[in-house]
A protein has these predicted regions:
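Soluble extramembrane regions of membrane proteins in the secretory/endomembrane system
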Residues: 84, 165-169
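Alpha-to-beta junction loops
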Residues: 31, 49-58, 111-113, 155-164
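Pocket-flanking alpha-helical
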Residues: 21-22, 34-75, 149-153, 169-170
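A structural signal for short loop-to-beta-strand junctions that line the ligand-binding cleft
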Residues: 74-87, 92
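Residues that line or immediately flank small-molecule/substrate-binding pockets and catalytic motifs
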Residues: 60, 144, 166
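Bilobed "Venus flytrap"/periplasmic-binding protein-like clamshell domains
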Residues: 2-27, 31-32, 90-156
Length: 170
């Protein structure tokens, strides 16, 4: 069995992994594939390094950090994996309600926001953007939610915004 680390079911990695494994199952009879829901990029790199999965999707910036032991992976380099392909470009977006009054990242000060699932590429990108905007954790109330949870809480007005790093077509 080949275990494929995707991400949460609400993002693009999970459906991509399912489509990929369906195609591979048709092409390579006798190989069993299992898509694993994970927190995302950083988690997949850790799971690959720990031999819990054999294949995983990760953002290029986090692959670089893991390889060199910096940023999210400052505690040490990760090894035991290699890049196979570049899938598609991704962009980090900030999602808000139309009536929120939030027009730029600077408007997030004092707001409750989801920075993505813990160990996800979205979390890393959100923290980078907040840092550049001069918004440390003391100035925003952050929650670690996957996309589905964040969208639900945004609709219920329990959070003010959420970060989403996903394929450009999202």
């Amino acid at each position: 069995t080949i275990r494929f680390g995707a991400a949460g079911v609400g993002g693009m990695y999970y459906p991509f992994a399912n489509a990929y494994t369906e195609l591979m199952s048709e092409e390579e009879k006798g190989i069993n594939w299992k898509v694993k829901s994970t927190a995302g990029s950083a988690a997949n790199l850790r799971l690959l390094s720990d031999n819990y999965i054999e294949l995983g999707i990760a953002q290029a910036d986090l692959i670089d950090e893991a390889y060199y032991g910096k940023g999210t992976f400052h505690s040490g380099k990760y090894s035991g994996y290699k890049a196979v392909a570049s899938l598609y470009p991704e962009a980090c977006q900030i999602v808000v309600r139309k009536d929120s009054g939030i027009d730029s990242p600077d408007d997030l000060e004092g707001k409750t926001i989801s920075i993505g699932a813990e160990e996800s590429g979205t979390e890393r990108n959100a923290r980078q953007i907040l840092e550049v905007c001069g918004l440390p954790d003391a100035l925003v109330d952050t929650e670690n939610l996957d996309y589905t949870q964040a969208a639900d809480k945004l609709e219920e007005k329990k959070i003010d915004a959420f970060f989403c790093t996903a394929g450009v077509s999202t």
